[in-house]
Regions:
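Short helix-boundary/capping micro-motifs
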Residues: 13-28
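Central regulatory/effector-binding core of bacterial HTH transcription factors
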Residues: 91-151, 300-301
Length: 304
């Protein structure tokens, strides 16, 4: 096989961006050069390495095997560059997706701690709330809410987090504090846009409090928190985010709550790459350190 190493690295760049134009820009090449390199790789390997999708280019089975080799090459080159200080295998770029809250309060501090030990590591986080993808071209790690149903992927549970009802102290002073769950029908909900919600497990408030109508909805959980603090309505919020704000009061913590799991998804061979294995462990460690807040045991401002 006379496959050129450069062709594999070009495929790696395309797999991470899903687009020839972006890969070309990142590599300092032209679009036509990237196209030629991919065509040459297809000829050398005897099959297609990429397939078109709605979001760009996705790896075929052959392409995934080729990218695994390219990642090993990338790691080896990075190790050679660190020979003066001793090889640090936790280097390169790791790309992950996660929900907004997880990205801010779990992933971000985990990455910060990890990079203090491994400054050659770079992590790209795309915030999104959705089910796990069946094709994850360009992604190393996905963190999703709810147990995923995936093929040709490894899934592991990271831990649970709790959601509860919250209202601002000013809102309760103006509108009155509901004395029971039944009285929630007199108030409106701050939560996700129902028609755009892609995760079934997150549809809890429509099941738990069906009489509540929407006040303000958004695809971003930080909007939920700030809208609730501003008095837009009663929010159904992750406790580890809401309990950070002393102006928010948790309502009916013993009866109006939902506990959901965070799951991590990655390709079966991804843990062979030291950078990915290190980040996965860092995320687990941060989940454990933050467990009390995640499970709703960090707040003191409650109304039963």
């Amino acid at each position: 096989m006379d496959t050129m190493p450069n062709d594999l690295l070009v495929l790696l760049a395309v797999s991470r961006t899903a687009k020839f134009t972006t890969a070309a820009h990142n590599l300092g090449l032209t679009h036509s050069t990237v196209s030629r390199r991919i065509s040459a790789l297809k000829k050398s390997l005897g099959g297609r390495v990429l397939a078109r999708s709605d979001d760009g280019w996705e790896l075929t089975d052959l392409g995934e095997r080729a990218v695994a080799v390219a990642e090993q090459m990338e790691t080896a080159v990075a190790e050679l560059g660190n020979t003066r200080q001793g090889p640090d295998t936790v280097t390169g770029v790791v790309r992950m997706t996660a929900t907004d809250g997880f990205s801010a309060y779990i992933a971000s501090p985990a990455v910060a701690k990890l990079r203090r030990r491994h400054p050659g590591l770079s992590v790209e986080i795309v915030t999104v709330t959705r089910q796990a993808l069946q094709q994850r071209s360009g992604l190393d790690i996905e963190v999703v809410v709810g147990e995923p149903r995936v093929h040709r992927a490894e899934a592991m549970k990271l831990g649970d987090y709790e959601l509860g009802l919250y209202a601002s102290s000013d809102y309760l002073a103006a509108r009155g504090t509901p004395a029971s769950v039944d009285e929630l029908s007199d108030h409106r909900l701050v939560y996700f846009v129902d028609s755009m919600l892609q995760v079934d497990d997150l549809d809890a408030p429509r099941r738990l409090f069906p009489s509540m109508k929407d006040a303000l909805t958004s695809t971003n959980v930080f909007v939920h928190v700030e809208a609730t603090r501003a008095g837009a309505g009663i929010g159904f919020l992750p406790c580890f985010m809401a309990d950070r704000h002393p102006d928010l009061v948790r309502l009916f913590p013993d009866t109006a709550a939902e506990r959901l799991p965070y799951w991590l998804v990655l390709r079966p061979d991804s843990m062979r790459r030291p950078a990915i294995a290190a980040l996965v462990q860092a995320l687990k460690d941060q989940m454990l350190a933050y467990r009390g807040a995640l499970e709703g045991r960090g707040g003191t401002n409650r109304h039963n």
